[in-house]
Swiss-Prot record:
NCBIfam families: PRK04199.1-3, PRK04199.1-4. SUPFAM superfamilies: Ribosomal protein L16p/L10e. This is Large ribosomal subunit protein uL16. One of its GO terms (cellular component) is ribosome. GO terms for molecular function: structural constituent of ribosome. It comes from Methanosphaerula palustris (strain ATCC BAA-1556 / DSM 19958 / E1-9c). It comes from the Archaea. The keyword Ribosomal protein applies. The gene is rpl10e. Belongs to the universal ribosomal protein uL16 family. It holds the Pfam family Ribosomal_L16. Keywords: Ribonucleoprotein, Ribosomal protein.
Amino acid sequence: MVRKPGKMYRNLAKKAYTRRKYMGGVPGSKIVQFEMGNLSQEFPVEISLEVLESCQIRHTALEAARIAINRKMMDQVGRANFHFKIRTYPHHVLRENKQATGAGADRVSEGMRMAFGKAVGTAARVQPKQKVFTVYTNEQYIEKSKDALRHGGYKLPSPARLVIERVPVDNTQ
């Protein structure tokens, strides 16, 4: 079956469907890592990508954005000069009532009978001004980090903006 376009799952139409205990066969999340880069060092600058509208972000879109941001950061900044973190998790299970197409589909298809649907993926439900991705880095890499996060934001279904904050670093060690 063909995967449906992401715009079909973008809106928060119903309440969250997360109880996997009662579901059979929920596909696993495609997100491989939630933290990348230099995890041991503390950085003075925090740059976050926050969404401007409430929406559902599919796990495939989160993974695509993660790959885009991480690759750009590795090329332009280097692994030792940043800490990249995904701040949301795709808990919401997406369902789809599969429809048969082609010759003889009318004999095979059930139509709207038992139309609850099967689990086809997961999504993160986000609210306005919620941070989705965060990069911690040094002062000299702010512009390159902003560029990387902007590229990752193009993969999300909601418009997004960048928020830059200074973090006090503890140097007493």
